[in-house]
Amino acid sequence: MEVKVFDNDVEKALKILKNKLSKSGLFKELKVRRAYEKPSVKRKRKAIEARRRFAKVQRRRSS
């Protein structure tokens, strides 16, 4: 991933980079891969994520 620095404003470039990384899901992936995840825990996490996505879609449809 690449971020351009304008006017030597490194703080703003870091903020943009962090935003891009979080939107791409890299931070979440790093957190998951930090330690071994048992298959049962993995299934449970995936089910919770799917439920959240479904609820989000339902909220958008009802609005």
Swiss-Prot record:
Any Pfam family the entry gives: Ribosomal_S21
Keywords: Ribonucleoprotein, Ribosomal protein
Gene3D superfamilies xrefs: Ribosomal protein S8
Keyword Ribonucleoprotein recorded: yes
Disulfide bonds: none
Organism superkingdom: Bacteria
GO BP term, pick one: translation
GO molecular function, one term: structural constituent of ribosome
Ribonucleoprotein keyword on record: yes
GO CC, any one term: ribosome
Sequence similarity: Belongs to the bacterial ribosomal protein bS21 family.
Alphabetical list of HAMAP family matching this protein: Ribosomal_bS21 (MF_00358)
The protein's name: Small ribosomal subunit protein bS21
Species assigned in the record: Syntrophus aciditrophicus (strain SB)
Organism taxonomic ancestry: Bacteria, Pseudomonadati, Thermodesulfobacteriota, Syntrophia, Syntrophales
Gene: rpsU
